Amino acid sequence: MEMKVRVSHWHEDVVVCEVTDDTAPSHILEGLARKGLGYALWGENIETPIIVIDNRGDLTPDQLLAIEAHELGHIMTKSLKETDAELFGIALLRANGRQAAADILLERGVV
């Protein structure tokens, strides 16, 4: 299984799993097939929130940051709404001087 596991850049209580090839567990690959480049696992029954990012296509560092910030937005706002996560992610990236990554989210047109 090839995954990079680390603590989130912006929240020490959130784990990030970066999938780098097709040998990741099937339930993780199925989640990515349904959700796209990333998804967040959080809620009442989840002790440690997890962000899963699909990096099988060699994303740029700014793309990885944009995905992480967006998914962290779902966790921090406790919202399934894409607009809530996107606005949180853009604000987080801007506040941390990562305008190029924020621009990636802005260019998606979610907000």
Name each model feature, range by range.
Residues 79-111:
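Post-HExxH zinc-binding segment in Zn-dependent metallohydrolases
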Residues 14-17, 51-53, 68-69, 85:
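Hydrophobic beta-strand residues in large extracellular and virion-surface proteins
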Residues 66-78:
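Active-site recognition of the HExxH zinc-binding catalytic motif
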